[in-house]
């Protein structure tokens, strides 16, 4: 009887351990290109996840390499929510009233919404105005965990250093330059 109980307990323990290794345990995806954002407040480093959002990462890296984000200003900052940038009009201080209304006009075309990535503090995702497949250049960084956004936006990266800088960003702060490390 004891031998059966021990074997059953050992078997149950193994099943639970194996289950915990994959199902329900979020694991960090393989990292892709690292993006550095030099702002007027300091430097932010982002690790991207092309395994979860390949087209989104490809589009983002292409825009970074084309210097698209350089000299843009953050147009949206909501305390305990997000900071947001990516409107080319934000390079022009005279257009401040219109910042945030457009992107580069070239939608990614797919909604790469990963079940592995969640909106924890420092998550990086693509902003959109109703259809995730129409996201183009505007991206955001979460200032706090926002589970209510999960499944609605394409997450493609995570801040790995400079979260203290992210927390200091205000509307109008400048991206001096962004580059692939």
Task: Report the location of each language-model feature.
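Sec-dependent N-terminal signal peptides
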Residues: 7-16
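Cyclophilin-like peptidyl-prolyl cis-trans isomerases
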Residues: 2-3, 16-181
């Amino acid at each position: 009887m004891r031998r059966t109980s021990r074997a059953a307990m050992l078997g149950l323990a193994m099943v639970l351990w194996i289950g915990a290794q994959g199902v329900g345990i979020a694991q960090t995806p393989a990292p892709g290109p690292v993006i550095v954002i030099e702002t007027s407040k300091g430097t932010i480093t982002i690790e991207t996840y092309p395994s979860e959002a390949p087209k989104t990462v490809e589009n983002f890296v292409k825009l970074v390499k084309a210097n698209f984000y350089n000299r843009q200003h953050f147009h949206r900052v909501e305390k305990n929510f997000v900071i947001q940038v990516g409107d080319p009009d934000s390079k022009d201080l005279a257009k401040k009233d219109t910042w945030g209304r457009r992107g580069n006009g070239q939608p990614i075309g797919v909604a790469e919404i990963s079940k592995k990535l969640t909106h924890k503090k420092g998550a990086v995702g693509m902003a959109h105005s109703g259809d995730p497949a129409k996201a183009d250049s505007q991206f955001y960084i979460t200032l706090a965990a926002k589970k209510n956004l999960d499944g609605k936006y394409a997450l493609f990266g995570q801040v790995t250093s400079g979260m203290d800088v992210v927390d200091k960003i205000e509307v109008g702060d400048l991206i001096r330059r962004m580059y692939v490390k």
